[in-house]
Amino acid sequence: EARKILSGVEKTTSYVRNIHEGKAGTIKIGFISSSISGFLQTLVLAHRNKYPNVKIEMEQSISNRISDGLLENEFDIGIERIPVTLTAGLIAHDMPPESGSVAINENHPFAKRKQVRISDLKDQDLIFYPRWNGPDGYDDVMSMFREYGVEPNIVQEAPAQMTIAGLVASGIGIGVVPECMAKIKVANVTHRKLQCTKGRTGFTLITREKKDLLVNQFLDLAMMTKID
């Protein structure tokens, strides 16, 4: 009996030591839908390989909800997109920027082009996410259309990127999506770069200003990890 007690004490002591050294514990991540294009998977896999005893809990959400969750300690890290307005007490750690693109049904005439201009989208049926899903990104894209004198004809809104892809496959319209979504293959859907959008968007990792060791380790690894 004494040996069992001693063994239990040793295990507890070891676990506490591992937590203190950043080798054990839990990280809670809130992420937006476009991060499933490979960004999220790459980071989590790299982290699990280096810190196998650190548990990662993930929940898909929307931009505003992620920010609230960080402030309420429901999340430790939020994966969002720039541009994003930061709430007091939060800080952003930007990843490499990317361009915008369009998701097109393979039977659409634009599928024969190498790239699409913003002006080409005039009078086209478009699919985009609702403003409540990410106000900053939504407003930025609408501003981009106005810069080129285009009034976007949004015929369908969808909060999740994979839903947008499904609607494009169904012939509902053209999806305005981040470039990374081209990595996810969907039947009857192809992607083309949207001209003049280079560096307009990209992922960012949002954290509280006061970060613990586990979060700092995740951020350090994220900055060193190559995202294809």
Which residues are covered by each model-predicted region?
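Alpha-to-beta junction loops
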Residues: 71-79, 100, 150, 168-175
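Flexible hinge/capping segments at coil-to-helix
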Residues: 21, 92-100, 104-126, 216
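Alpha-helical "hinge/linker" immediately C-terminal to small N-terminal DNA-binding modules
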Residues: 1-18, 24
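Central regulatory/effector-binding core of bacterial HTH transcription factors
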Residues: 24-87, 158
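Secondary-structure junction motif
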Residues: 125-148, 212-219
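A ligand-binding cleft/hinge motif common to bilobed small-molecule-binding domains
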Residues: 64, 81-88, 139-140, 147, ...
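Short beta-strand->loop
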Residues: 91-101, 176-180, 186-200
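A late-sequence structural motif
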Residues: 39, 190-228
